């Protein structure tokens, strides 16, 4: 079912060729149901690839969703032209008065930097607080998840001895949780991070949903702040990890082969996507839970009144 995105957004053609139903504004205006309002705060330099990955998953439900692409005031992007940002993205200041049913905060390639040294950290603090008054439920991804856990719960992170890089088996700890309905008992998840979070610093308001003996916690649910934290990358394409590997090799970096990615550990071969179905199922479940619990009157989002 449909997602509504800007008519000229390049991701539109990619999504349509994959069979994703993309709706234009004139068609959506004739429907009587209230579209769900979702925002995507895209912190990645390659905006087009990231927005396509998340739009693909957000579009996988029978619900009409209006997706607003959001960026911080600092463009962050050397690979995305300014006119592209002007045409398709709003700054957070542009949308801070709006209400959203769902909001996604992506990762960012700044894993080795203390949070407080990130140049847009003051704006991130405002955004994370703003989700409590203007968003019904938020999903934080990778660095975004670590940042939110640090700010909202004081969760500590630490640098691992070796980068977790590849596709790892994970255990589902609560198959009855609304976000994990239909999940198998274990799943393959793409991982690319240097840091992990300290379990001992988790607050009682946080429930671990997906975990791994090899690379640590994958996903948590936050009952207090209406949020989910996905520390890894179910949204990734087949080639996301492979592209990262080849990029680093070409740059002369000593990069290990991604674990369990290439068939026969041959980096010339196309990786197989073994996580796609769980990625779609996670977003279907998450969006359905939002649909079931969000106020019909959008202005009541974040007020606790409906």
Curated annotation (Swiss-Prot):
It is an enzyme of class 2 (transferase). The record marks 192 as: Important for substrate specificity. Belongs to the MetA family. One of its GO terms (cellular component) is cytoplasm. It holds the Pfam family HTS. GO terms for biological process: L-methionine biosynthetic process from homoserine via O-succinyl-L-homoserine and cystathionine. Its EC number is 2.3.1.46. One of its GO terms (molecular function) is homoserine O-acetyltransferase activity. The record marks 111 as: Important for acyl-CoA specificity. Keywords: Acyltransferase, Amino-acid biosynthesis, Cytoplasm, Methionine biosynthesis, Transferase. It is found in: Cytoplasm. It comes from Pelagibacterium halotolerans (strain DSM 22347 / JCM 15775 / CGMCC 1.7692 / B2). InterPro entries: Class_I_gatase-like (IPR029062), HST_MetA (IPR005697), MetA_family (IPR033752). It comes from the Bacteria. Substrate binds at residues 163, 192, 247. It catalyses: L-homoserine + succinyl-CoA = O-succinyl-L-homoserine + CoA. The active site is at 142 (acyl-thioester intermediate), 233 (proton acceptor), 235. HAMAP family: MetA_acyltransf (MF_00295). The lineage of its organism: Bacteria, Pseudomonadati, Pseudomonadota, Alphaproteobacteria, Hyphomicrobiales. This is Homoserine O-succinyltransferase.
